[in-house]
């Protein structure tokens, strides 16, 4: 019987909140297990003055944590699924996810309630090329300023007038308890498809760790786990990085079938391709790969 678990995570406020959500799930089923949080500073946290696509992509938020997992300095790692690349080290596996939070993006703005109503040539703070592609599709006149850093620092830049608006994920704002309906406006899926895995907290372990597999199987939210399969299959086949505008969002139509909306753009965000597929859960991963092949052929 396992007495304690060392849980690796980024040292940000949001990452620690998400880690505690995982611990709550573990404690509900295994109340006697001691959970030790091991905060790890990642390269992505240290380099804040450059866009992710210039310095190695979102994998920079995982590199040191995954190495600690491989070195057996921690027993499991907690990540935002949206930060996990399509391909991870062969010795590791995503063994569990928590129930998905609303994955929509949010326009945070003091004076306007939508991208459409922003003034001509307004400035939006965002670092994601996916968001840039959708913004340019909705409002080609808008200027996009590369914004990185935690939620508090981004909101501070908005409050000081550095930009007219910023775009953040609803899940992060809610978990930080800073979603304010007066200034935070949800963007519907039809206007901005979420990042692959957005809203999902993921647990990564070593493939050969049977004890951790057992624990993860107890906390895994299977409906969410099934939905992320086609999204991540799409991502893995394209081998996309932070310089590629890409999105996918799967949702249940009924107990057995799901709808997946895909988006793929070119590097300068001037061309965006959309595709929608309906498939059985059992074939959803194949569907994600099929969509990737078809959309690549259209580029």
Curated annotation (Swiss-Prot):
Q: List GO molecular-function terms, semicolon-separated.
A: hydroxymethylbilane synthase activity
PTM sites of type S-(dipyrrolylmethanemethyl)cysteine: 242
User: What enzyme category does the UniProt record give?
Assistant: transferase
Q: Which CDD domains match?
A: PBP2_PBGD_2
Q: Which GO terms describe its cellular component?
A: cytoplasm
Q: Which cofactor does it need?
A: dipyrromethane
Q: Which UniProt keywords apply?
A: Porphyrin biosynthesis, Transferase
Q: Which domain of life is it from?
A: Bacteria
Q: Which GO BP terms, alphabetically?
A: protoporphyrinogen IX biosynthetic process
Q: What is its EC number?
A: 2.5.1.61
Catalytic activity reads:
4 porphobilinogen + H2O = hydroxymethylbilane + 4 NH4(+)
List the InterPro entries hit by this protein, alphabetically: HemC, Porphobilin_deaminase_cofac_BS, Porphobilin_deaminase_N, Porphobilinogen_deaminase_C, Porphobilinogen_deaminase_C_sf
Q: Pathway it belongs to?
A: Porphyrin-containing compound metabolism; protoporphyrin-IX biosynthesis; coproporphyrinogen-III from 5-aminolevulinate: step 2/4
What does the entry comment about cofactor binding?
Binds 1 dipyrromethane group covalently.
- Give the family, as the similarity comment puts it: Belongs to the HMBS family.
Give a short account of what the protein does.
Answer: Tetrapolymerization of the monopyrrole PBG into the hydroxymethylbilane pre-uroporphyrinogen in several discrete steps.
Q: Other notes on this protein? A: The porphobilinogen subunits are added to the dipyrromethane group.
Record's subunit section: Monomer.
Name of the protein in question: Porphobilinogen deaminase
Q: Which species does the entry assign this protein to? A: Rickettsia prowazekii (strain Madrid E)
Taxonomic lineage is: Bacteria, Pseudomonadati, Pseudomonadota, Alphaproteobacteria, Rickettsiales
